[in-house]
Protein backbone atom coordinates (compact mmCIF):
# COMPACT_ATOMS: atom_id res chain seq x y z
CA UNK A 1 0.00 0.00 0.00
CA UNK A 2 1.03 3.60 -0.62
CA UNK A 3 0.32 6.39 1.87
CA UNK A 4 0.33 10.10 1.03
CA UNK A 5 0.34 13.07 3.41
CA UNK A 6 -0.94 16.61 2.97
CA UNK A 7 2.62 17.90 3.56
CA UNK A 8 3.77 16.23 0.35
CA UNK A 9 5.34 13.16 1.94
CA UNK A 10 4.64 9.57 0.99
CA UNK A 11 5.29 6.20 2.59
CA UNK A 12 4.47 2.54 2.16
CA UNK A 13 2.41 0.12 4.22
CA UNK A 14 0.79 -3.30 4.17
CA UNK A 15 -2.81 -4.44 4.65
CA UNK A 16 -3.28 -6.80 7.59
CA UNK A 17 -7.04 -6.95 6.93
CA UNK A 18 -9.11 -5.36 4.19
CA UNK A 19 -9.69 -2.34 6.42
CA UNK A 20 -6.49 -2.15 8.47
CA UNK A 21 -3.03 -1.10 7.27
CA UNK A 22 0.27 -1.40 9.12
CA UNK A 23 2.95 1.25 8.56
CA UNK A 24 5.72 3.09 10.39
CA UNK A 25 4.65 5.56 13.09
CA UNK A 26 6.93 8.28 11.70
CA UNK A 27 4.89 8.14 8.47
CA UNK A 28 1.72 9.34 10.21
CA UNK A 29 2.82 12.15 12.51
CA UNK A 30 0.20 14.58 13.87
CA UNK A 31 -0.48 17.79 11.96
CA UNK A 32 -1.21 16.37 8.52
CA UNK A 33 -4.03 14.62 6.68
CA UNK A 34 -3.39 11.23 5.11
CA UNK A 35 -4.84 9.11 2.31
CA UNK A 36 -4.21 5.52 1.32
CA UNK A 37 -3.59 4.91 -2.36
CA UNK A 38 -4.81 1.67 -3.89
CA UNK A 39 -4.26 0.83 -7.55
CA UNK A 40 -6.89 -0.89 -9.68
CA UNK A 41 -6.21 -3.48 -12.38
CA UNK A 42 -5.42 -0.69 -14.87
CA UNK A 43 -2.88 0.86 -12.46
CA UNK A 44 -5.17 3.81 -11.82
CA UNK A 45 -4.85 5.24 -8.29
CA UNK A 46 -7.83 5.10 -5.95
CA UNK A 47 -7.72 7.29 -2.84
CA UNK A 48 -9.01 5.73 0.38
CA UNK A 49 -10.09 7.81 3.36
CA UNK A 50 -8.39 7.24 6.70
CA UNK A 51 -10.80 6.79 9.62
CA UNK A 52 -8.33 6.58 12.51
CA UNK A 53 -4.57 6.40 13.08
CA UNK A 54 -3.16 4.58 16.10
CA UNK A 55 0.53 5.04 16.83
CA UNK A 56 2.35 2.87 19.35
CA UNK A 57 2.60 4.82 22.63
CA UNK A 58 6.31 4.02 22.89
CA UNK A 59 7.20 5.72 19.61
CA UNK A 60 9.89 8.44 19.69
CA UNK A 61 10.38 10.34 16.43
CA UNK A 62 13.82 11.60 17.51
CA UNK A 63 15.02 8.01 17.85
CA UNK A 64 14.09 7.32 14.22
CA UNK A 65 16.04 10.38 13.08
CA UNK A 66 19.10 9.00 14.89
CA UNK A 67 18.53 5.47 13.58
CA UNK A 68 17.95 4.29 17.14
CA UNK A 69 15.51 1.73 18.50
CA UNK A 70 11.90 2.84 19.00
CA UNK A 71 8.36 1.53 18.54
CA UNK A 72 8.05 2.82 14.97
CA UNK A 73 4.71 1.09 14.39
CA UNK A 74 1.24 2.42 13.55
CA UNK A 75 -2.13 1.09 12.42
CA UNK A 76 -4.43 2.86 9.97
CA UNK A 77 -8.13 2.08 10.04
CA UNK A 78 -9.78 2.81 6.70
CA UNK A 79 -13.24 4.17 6.02
CA UNK A 80 -13.89 1.63 3.25
CA UNK A 81 -12.46 -1.84 2.55
CA UNK A 82 -9.57 -2.48 0.20
CA UNK A 83 -9.54 -4.84 -2.75
CA UNK A 84 -6.18 -6.37 -1.85
CA UNK A 85 -5.46 -9.73 -0.26
CA UNK A 86 -4.18 -9.05 3.30
CA UNK A 87 -0.71 -10.15 4.34
CA UNK A 88 0.01 -12.55 7.19
CA UNK A 89 1.69 -11.34 10.35
CA UNK A 90 4.63 -13.53 11.37
CA UNK A 91 3.95 -15.68 14.45
CA UNK A 92 5.73 -15.16 17.75
CA UNK A 93 9.13 -16.71 18.33
CA UNK A 94 10.67 -16.33 14.86
CA UNK A 95 14.43 -16.05 15.41
CA UNK A 96 16.63 -13.84 13.23
CA UNK A 97 20.36 -14.33 12.71
CA UNK A 98 22.95 -12.63 10.51
CA UNK A 99 22.71 -13.79 6.90
CA UNK A 100 19.00 -14.64 7.05
CA UNK A 101 17.15 -13.63 3.86
CA UNK A 102 14.28 -11.12 3.75
CA UNK A 103 12.12 -9.45 1.11
CA UNK A 104 11.30 -5.73 1.30
CA UNK A 105 8.46 -4.41 -0.89
CA UNK A 106 7.65 -0.70 -1.09
CA UNK A 107 6.63 2.23 -3.27
CA UNK A 108 9.77 4.30 -2.73
CA UNK A 109 11.89 6.03 -5.33
CA UNK A 110 14.42 4.14 -7.42
CA UNK A 111 16.81 7.12 -7.42
CA UNK A 112 17.22 9.36 -4.40
CA UNK A 113 15.82 12.82 -5.07
CA UNK A 114 13.86 11.72 -8.14
CA UNK A 115 10.24 11.64 -6.99
CA UNK A 116 9.06 10.59 -10.44
CA UNK A 117 10.56 7.14 -9.89
CA UNK A 118 8.33 6.51 -6.85
CA UNK A 119 4.78 5.18 -6.75
CA UNK A 120 5.67 1.80 -8.26
CA UNK A 121 5.96 -1.20 -5.99
CA UNK A 122 9.41 -2.78 -6.07
CA UNK A 123 10.82 -5.68 -4.12
CA UNK A 124 14.39 -6.37 -3.02
CA UNK A 125 15.95 -9.46 -1.51
CA UNK A 126 18.23 -8.45 1.35
CA UNK A 127 20.02 -10.23 4.18
CA UNK A 128 20.37 -9.46 7.88
CA UNK A 129 23.71 -8.04 8.92
CA UNK A 130 25.41 -7.19 12.21
CA UNK A 131 23.62 -8.48 15.31
CA UNK A 132 19.90 -8.61 14.48
CA UNK A 133 17.41 -9.07 17.30
CA UNK A 134 13.99 -8.10 18.60
CA UNK A 135 14.88 -4.40 18.88
CA UNK A 136 16.23 -3.65 15.40
CA UNK A 137 17.24 -5.48 12.23
CA UNK A 138 19.67 -4.03 9.71
CA UNK A 139 19.46 -5.38 6.18
CA UNK A 140 21.87 -5.06 3.26
CA UNK A 141 22.23 -6.17 -0.33
CA UNK A 142 24.33 -9.36 -0.10
CA UNK A 143 26.40 -8.14 -3.05
CA UNK A 144 27.48 -4.84 -1.50
CA UNK A 145 27.06 -5.72 2.21
CA UNK A 146 26.17 -2.11 2.95
CA UNK A 147 29.64 -0.88 1.98
CA UNK A 148 28.99 -0.56 -1.76
CA UNK A 149 25.86 0.79 -3.43
CA UNK A 150 23.22 -1.86 -3.91
CA UNK A 151 19.56 -2.63 -3.38
CA UNK A 152 17.73 -1.29 -0.35
CA UNK A 153 14.98 1.00 0.90
CA UNK A 154 14.84 4.63 -0.20
CA UNK A 155 12.58 7.67 0.16
CA UNK A 156 8.96 6.51 0.25
CA UNK A 157 9.78 3.00 1.46
CA UNK A 158 9.33 3.87 5.14
CA UNK A 159 6.56 1.70 6.57
CA UNK A 160 7.04 -0.92 3.87
CA UNK A 161 6.56 -4.54 4.91
CA UNK A 162 9.59 -6.72 5.50
CA UNK A 163 8.83 -10.36 4.76
CA UNK A 164 10.43 -13.53 6.04
CA UNK A 165 9.59 -17.05 4.89
CA UNK A 166 7.78 -18.85 7.70
CA UNK A 167 6.33 -22.30 7.18
CA UNK A 168 6.78 -22.13 3.43
CA UNK A 169 5.00 -18.77 2.94
CA UNK A 170 6.04 -15.15 3.33
CA UNK A 171 4.93 -13.38 6.51
CA UNK A 172 5.43 -9.79 7.69
CA UNK A 173 8.15 -9.68 10.33
CA UNK A 174 8.89 -5.94 10.37
CA UNK A 175 8.49 -2.51 8.78
CA UNK A 176 11.11 -0.23 7.21
CA UNK A 177 12.13 2.67 9.49
CA UNK A 178 15.20 4.22 7.84
CA UNK A 179 17.93 3.76 5.26
CA UNK A 180 21.50 4.84 4.60
CA UNK A 181 23.80 5.14 1.64
CA UNK A 182 26.91 2.95 1.28
CA UNK A 183 29.23 2.89 4.31
CA UNK A 184 26.63 4.72 6.46
CA UNK A 185 26.59 7.79 4.20
CA UNK A 186 23.45 9.81 3.57
CA UNK A 187 21.09 8.38 0.98
CA UNK A 188 20.02 4.93 -0.13
CA UNK A 189 21.57 1.67 -1.26
CA UNK A 190 23.46 0.94 1.96
CA UNK A 191 21.62 -0.31 5.04
CA UNK A 192 17.88 -0.70 5.48
CA UNK A 193 16.79 -0.25 9.09
CA UNK A 194 13.85 -2.41 10.15
CA UNK A 195 11.63 -2.25 13.22
CA UNK A 196 10.87 -5.91 13.97
CA UNK A 197 7.33 -6.68 15.10
CA UNK A 198 8.14 -9.36 17.66
CA UNK A 199 7.98 -6.93 20.58
CA UNK A 200 4.86 -5.21 19.24
CA UNK A 201 2.86 -8.15 17.91
CA UNK A 202 0.59 -8.38 20.96
CA UNK A 203 -0.12 -4.64 20.75
CA UNK A 204 -0.95 -4.92 17.03
CA UNK A 205 -3.34 -7.83 17.65
CA UNK A 206 -5.00 -6.03 20.57
CA UNK A 207 -5.43 -2.75 18.69
CA UNK A 208 -6.73 -4.49 15.56
CA UNK A 209 -9.50 -6.08 17.62
CA UNK A 210 -10.34 -2.74 19.29
CA UNK A 211 -10.57 -1.10 15.87
CA UNK A 212 -13.04 -3.72 14.66
CA UNK A 213 -10.57 -5.38 12.29
CA UNK A 214 -9.40 -8.50 14.16
CA UNK A 215 -6.50 -10.39 12.66
CA UNK A 216 -6.97 -14.03 11.66
CA UNK A 217 -5.55 -16.55 14.17
Regions found by a protein language model. Name each.
Residues 8-10, 21, 27-29, 60, ...:
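Solvent-exposed loop/turn segments at secondary-structure junctions
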Residues 151-155:
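Glycine-centered low-complexity coil/loop motifs and glycine-rich tracts
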Residues 15, 29, 45-47, 66-70, ...:
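Extracellular/periplasmic catalytic domains that process cell-envelope and extracellular macromolecules
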Residues 20, 32, 100, 157-160:
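Surface-exposed loop/turn positions
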Residues 1-8, 12:
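N-terminal activation segment of mature serine protease catalytic domains
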Residues 34-84, 89-94, 116:
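Conserved catalytic-core segment of clan PA serine endopeptidases
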Residues 10, 15-28, 36, 43, ...:
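C-terminal subregion of chymotrypsin/trypsin-like serine protease catalytic domains
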Residues 70-73, 78-150, 190, 197-202:
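Chymotrypsin/trypsin-fold serine protease catalytic domain
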Amino acid sequence: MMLTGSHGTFCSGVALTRSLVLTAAHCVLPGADYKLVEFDSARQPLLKDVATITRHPGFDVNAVLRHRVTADVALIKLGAPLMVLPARLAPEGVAVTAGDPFVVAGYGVAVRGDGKTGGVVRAARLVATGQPGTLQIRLADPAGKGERAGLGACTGDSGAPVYREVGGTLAVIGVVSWSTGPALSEGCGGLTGVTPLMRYRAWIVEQAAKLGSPLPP
